[in-house]
Amino acid sequence: HYMAKLVRAGVDLFDVDLGCYDNWWLPHPPEGMPAGCFLDMSKIAKEFFRRNRIKSNTGVDVPVVAVGKLGYPDIAEKAIRDGDCDMVMLARPLLADPDWCNKAFAGNVEEIRPCIGCQEGCVNEFILGGHPQCAVNPRTGFEERFPETFTPAEKKKNIAVVGGGPAGITFALIAAKRGHNVTLYEKSEKLGGKIAVGSIPKIKFDLRNYLAYLEKQMELCQEQYQLQVHKSTTVTAELLKEKAYDSVIFAYGTKEIFPPFEGREEANLILGTDLLEHPEKAEGANNIVIVGGGVVGCETAHWLANEYGKNVTVLEMLPHFMMGVCTANRGHLLHYLEKSGVRLYNCTKVKALAKDGVYVEQNQSQTVPDPYNTWQPLLPPNIPNPMEKAIKEEIVEKKIPADLIVLAMGGKADETFFFEAGEEHLAKEIYNIGDSSRAGRVLEAVRGAYHLAVRI
């Protein structure tokens, strides 16, 4: 009835949204939330106006706009066709690809650069004091600095790209389009690097869409430009010497952090990335302990609990899980980890591993933050909170039973080959981009690759 009164008051159109900032993930739904997650709301509004025969002030049906993860042309089109809404509203999908509408209209859906719902650039950068950007579109927010069309290379070069993750792919695509002869080498049988592994859980469907987009762009670029791709190829110094490239771009990722915990030899131990690729290694393991409460650890926990029905515990030595992640994404995942029965232990240090469990020192003080709190920390890491209370220590030693221990402690930049190439002068120009330069997110990997590719 409130909406009916608004129509009488002169409202011409309704944007039907959901959520408030007590649950950050609803006002701007992150990765993991279903496509078209708020369509039920717009449908309810449309049915209300139809049932009560309420017309707009111009005598037509009251227009209702749907919003919320509608950057999928098939779902957006179906919502309008089925009468669930009259229009759809897009925001983040247009940051990822300003030509979304034109490509959808032309039927070139595979060429739409998809939003991955990470909110690394559009929300997090803004919160940290910057301006809205985009993890998958480096031009967003920098349109004056980077023209829409690439400037042709002044001197065409033979370039080798070592590594087929998001950084290597982004560089290869742009450099080839600018006229360089580019050869990309990938040691595995598929492209994608860390995003290929990270897109395995069902909730990571947005990342899978992005990977499919990159693969499609590579196919088109190989057909139209001087781009060659060699998968299942390990690059050596000898190979680079033999080819005599003008430039070599290293983009081969990180080394996994594997601390020398006491008892690691006897423990049933596996890296989180290895388990994602080989879930059969968790067969027979009911109680699983994950060491590391970053994004990989928490997403792996959700995957194990929801797709394989495992009892999962995640250990994190810091006060908060997934530090640095956008509050919406972080809160959404924490909320569903709690609903899935995943045990989160923060302020917990691993002391030793055993065949049947993990020995830890856990701070059980009442001042330790609630690990399931979806809105803490309240302020970004670059702004100190004067109201934040100090965490006191009440350390308790305990053993957490485990049939399988999963290490998800992140990785560090693997610069070994880069420095070796420099010492041996394997090319006139040698660069290091992506995680092999500095372990980071899709945002940093794509941005760094783009900045180099447009000027080399």
What are these regions (language model features)?
Residues 156-184, 230-241, 252-265, 273-327, ...:
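Rossmann-like dinucleotide/flavin-binding elements
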Residues 119, 123-166, 177, 191, ...:
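Extracellular/periplasmic ectodomains of large secreted or surface enzymes and adhesion receptors
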Residues 31-34, 83, 105-108, 200-204, ...:
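Short, hinge-like loop/turn segments at secondary-structure boundaries
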Residues 1-162, 166, 170-182, 190, ...:
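Flavin-dependent oxidoreductase catalytic cores
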Residues 181-228, 301-350, 437:
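Rossmann-like dinucleotide-binding cores of NAD(P)H-dependent redox enzymes
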